[in-house]
Amino acid sequence: MNIYSVGLFYFFLVFIGAQAMDLDITDYQSIDNTVNIMMKDLMNYWNASSQAFVASYWWVTGATMGALLYNYELFNNDTYVDLISSSLLYNAGSGFDYQPSFEYFNLGNDDQGMWAAAAMDAAEANFSPPNSTEHSWLELTQAAFNRMSGRWDSSTCGGGLRWQAFAWLNGYSYKASVSNALLFQLSSRLARFTNESVYSDWANKIWDWTTDVGFVNTTTYAVYDGADTSTNCTTLDPSQWSYNIGIFMVGAAYMYNYTGETVWRERLDGLISHATSYFFTDDIAWDPQCEYFDDCNSDQTAFKGIFMQSFGNTIRLAPYTYDTLYPLIQTSAAAAAKQCCGGYSGTSCGIYWFWNNGTWDDNYGVQEQFSALQAVQMLMIEYAPEIATLASSTDNRSNSTYASNVVINDTNTTTTIVVKEKDRGGAGFLTFLSAIFILGASIWALVEDEEGKIPSRGKKGIAISS
């Protein structure tokens, strides 16, 4: 293909456009139709051989499994049952702990936590259990939890979980809110599911540490990004991201649902109050830390998907929050759907929902599709079934000590594709490669990251005031 042909192709791909999705946020059929279109565009990025989405980080596939499970629950859609099950098992690795060998030299505690959360989603959805000779979804979650909690580090900052899992990884010196938020959420979910005090004890321990160190401000309930161990966590990165507060919010909702304690309701209300004021503009969800500067990287475009799911989860666990959270789901879903009018399909979703004018922002990919999908799917949250517990589950296999002292011996050497963050020119090129893949080519396989995990945070020291 000559340069002229490539230029025409790319022009056609990017600017074909289409009228924004005609979503009626009050009509089930309209919501269902919109979700089906979004799902179709999302699955264009699926690669069955790697059991992951291309042109995205490994953790994004884990988070997206949660979205597919919500699709299964809310729309009774069994189309992707085998895909979900296969991906959750394959990516768990031979240790069944979401520490697979192909991610071992790139593993963040947040990555592992995202996959564990997806396995927990499966357990709580009473999702078809794995092969009877394997472990239950609960046991996979417990194994990952034990791996992560085993890395709790009291040698610096008085405790906490580091961002990266192992000392040789860039970012190991950083204690990140997201890693601790995920461990907190897993603790609270496991406490409710199993009714075992070891998990609620962990949830209280993590909450106390994150508030003591200042990651969660108990006056404003702002959630800051984290701090480095070189300063003993005394200098906070003031960046605020929607997914951090969303993950904490869900954990608090589980603890309130499980314990009924007033203190957890107060904490939940504080997080909701800050989340609904800081991360919305004209009642539309946004991440001002990067969207304000038009500078969102490939991690950050997925954050609102997790944030929107956190609203749905919170409503399920604390129904009194419905009147506060659901109207914001509605306005955000409507705006997200208006951004889904680009790319080759004419329905690819962008990320700048706050534009809210039916024009596309030229961004697309797995993360953008995931985020918009979660916003629209949460419109059906009031019809979600009750979240299961071990007592109501069809699979009662549980092992709270699994993988707590297991030596890793994972022989699976398949390499997952991780696209390294680039400058804007590089990002455009990767977008071009992704588009070619969608049309059936395989250029994506050549774009493997060889330098390891790239930090997902924005510029240090730059923060939007609360």
Swiss-Prot record:
An example molecular function term from Gene Ontology annotations: mannan endo-1,6-alpha-mannosidase activity
Q: Which top EC class is given?
A: hydrolase
Name the InterPro entries on file: 6-hairpin_glycosidase_sf (IPR008928), Glyco_hydro_76 (IPR005198), Mannan-1_6-alpha_mannosidase (IPR014480)
| Cellular component GO terms, alphabetical | external side of plasma membrane
List the SUPFAM superfamilies: Six-hairpin glycosidases (SSF48208)
What's its catalytic activity?
Random hydrolysis of (1->6)-alpha-D-mannosidic linkages in unbranched (1->6)-mannans
Q: Signal sequence span per UniProt?
A: 1-20
Q: Name one Pfam family in it.
A: Glyco_hydro_76
Q: What is its EC number?
A: 3.2.1.101
Q: Which GO terms describe its biological process?
A: carbohydrate catabolic process; fungal-type cell wall biogenesis; septum digestion after cytokinesis
Q: Superkingdom, according to UniProt?
A: Eukaryota
**Glycan-linked positions:** N47, N77, N131, N195, N217, N232, N257, N357, N396, N399, N409, N412
Q: What family does the database annotate?
A: Belongs to the glycosyl hydrolase 76 family.
User: What name has this protein been given in UniProt?
Assistant: Putative mannan endo-1,6-alpha-mannosidase C1198.06c
Taxonomy of origin reads:
Eukaryota, Fungi, Dikarya, Ascomycota, Taphrinomycotina
